[in-house]
Amino acid sequence: MGEKESGDAGEAQRERILRAAALVMAERGFDAARMRDVARGAGVSIGLLQHYFDTRDLLFREAFEWSIGELIARWRKGASAEPDPWRRFELLVRELADDPDLQRRCATWTEFCASAARRPELRDGVRRAHQDWRELVLGIAESGVAAGKFVPVVPTDVAVRSVLAAVDGCDMAVASGSGMGAEGYAAVILATARSVLGVRD
C-alpha cells in the first residue's frame, strides 16, 4: 500500500478512492458501507483513507457528491456546443443513459436519498444535487421557450420538476433491478420532457 501522493497523482488517487466508495455504497448502502471495502477496492490502506477523510461518514458523503458532480460536469461538457435546446436535452439524456456505470450511479443516488430520509446531516448533499440538476434543465427549458420551440403545458418550473421526478423514478427502477435498461431509461425521460415542455417539431 502506497503513501499519500501529491499534485496530479494525489488528485487521481483521491478520485480512485471516491469512485471505489461510491461503488461500495451502491452495493451495501450508506449505513452498511465499510472503509475496509473501499480500501480494498481502491488498492490503498485504511490509514491512507484517513489521511484524505477524517471520518467514514465524510468519505461516503464526498463520494456521493463526487459521483453526482462528475455526471453533471459530463452533461455540461457533452451538450455545451449544441445550439438547439431539444437536441441539447437529448444529448444530456443520452449521456445519462449511456453511462457505463448506470446501475452503480442509480443505486448510489437512490441509496443516498433513502439514507437522507433517516439522517438529517445528509440532506444538504441531496438538496445541492437536486438544485444542480434543476438549474441545468431549467436553463435548457428557458432557452427553448425563448426560441419559441417549447410551449410548456404547465408553468416552466413545474415542467422542469416533472422531468426531474421522471429521472428520479427511472433511477429507482434501474437501481431496483426492475428490468429497465438504458434504452427504456432514455425513452421514458425523453417522452416525459417532450410532453410537459410542449416541444414543437
Predicted regions and their residues:
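N-terminal intrinsically disordered/low-complexity leader segments
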Residues: M1-A12, R19, D201
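Generic hydrophobic, amphipathic alpha-helix propensity
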Residues: Q13-A21, V38, A63-S67, L71, ...
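Helix-turn-helix
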Residues: R16, L23-L58, E62
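Short coil/turn segments at alpha/beta junctions that flank glycine-rich nucleotide-binding fingerprints
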Residues: E27-D31, E82, A147
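Residues in soluble alpha-helical coiled-coils and helical-bundle/repeat scaffolds
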Residues: D54-L58, S80-P83, A97, D101, ...
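Hydrophobic alpha-helical connector segments
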Residues: E62, A73-C106, T156-V163, A186
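Amphipathic alpha-helical segments used for helix-helix packing
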Residues: R87-R88, D101-D124
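Hydrophobic/aromatic-rich alpha-helical bundle segments in the mid-to-C-terminal region
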Residues: L122-R127, Q131, V145-R194, R200-D201
